[in-house]
Amino acid sequence: MPEPPTLVRRGRLLRIGAAAVVLLAVATYVAVQYATGGRAKPRCVVASANGDGASYEFTAEQAVNAATISAVGTSRGMPERAVTIALATALQESGLRNIHHGDRDSLGLFQQRPSEGWGSERQIMDPVYAAERFYAHLAKIPGYSRLPLTVAAQRVQRSGYPQAYAKHEPDATLLAASLTGRAAASLTCDGRPAGGDGTRAGDPARVKSALVRDFGKDVAPAADRERRSVRIPVPATVESAQGGERQRGWELAQWAVSNASALHIERVSYAGREWTAGDTGDAADAWRKVSAKGPSGAGPGASGSVEEVRIVTGQ
């Protein structure tokens, strides 16, 4: 028995509608890929320095916030464990995004509440202030560095989900090792400014200002607008290869890479290695070896010499 004409027409219309939806989806995908060069957002990757293959991929926005949290912590003299706790907390609370909303009046990276004395809305939305407040509370907890991460974080945050921080510990550990400089050449970003391809013109003065904002005035960067560069002196000694100033240099260098998209940074050089925006491989490949003397002109770890981190902005 043939189907009624009404049902036939309805089926035909449904098929046409479904085809139109598929075509629209394909067209949207193609447009996004064309506009972004195949990637919706600039990305960053941090890799383990232990050779275990562990890695964590995140966005340029998250990289900027993570670098700020780490810089504020080390500038306060907090150990790497404190930075790990802070990063895991921010990953859980906000996904490392400086959000203007949350549960009740919670705001910012750590979802701090003005009504509970964390500061004003404007203060809490400042990542440097928010990180400083978190570390100030963490430092008051006796033996926090020996506590399980989720316990230490919960004593600061007093969250309704006290066990939730633990799941972020592996990623936070990778980030902290890299951003504190202990794991050298372990972080890379593609360096594309959000919403476009390539590296747009940058301003060395903006880079200098951001460095001082995150690390404090002691970082002493020197901006050279004519050469589009910022140079940060890192005093080096024989012992620095095992930590100390050498670790500080990598902290500054990987901070710069984390801020590449936001500040339109094109190249970062330190300790005989150079990172260039546009590299999409892993960190080991992105930080290429340069001359034996390194871009600063001083041999790595040479006694009495002064190494430097050199940051070049896009033109």
Positions of PLM-derived features:
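Short, functionally critical alpha-helical segments immediately adjacent to catalytic or ligand/cofactor-binding
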Residues: 69-70, 80-95, 156-157
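Alpha-helical segment that forms one wall of the substrate-binding/catalytic cleft
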Residues: 94-96, 116-164
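Substrate-binding/active-site groove segments that recognize
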Residues: 104-119
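A charged, amphipathic interaction segment
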Residues: 144-206, 264, 268
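Extracellularly exposed regions in secreted/surface proteins, prominently low-complexity, repeat-rich
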Residues: 176-178, 261, 268-315
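Flexible, glycine-rich surface segments
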Residues: 187-251
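C-terminal soluble interaction/assembly domains
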Residues: 250-266
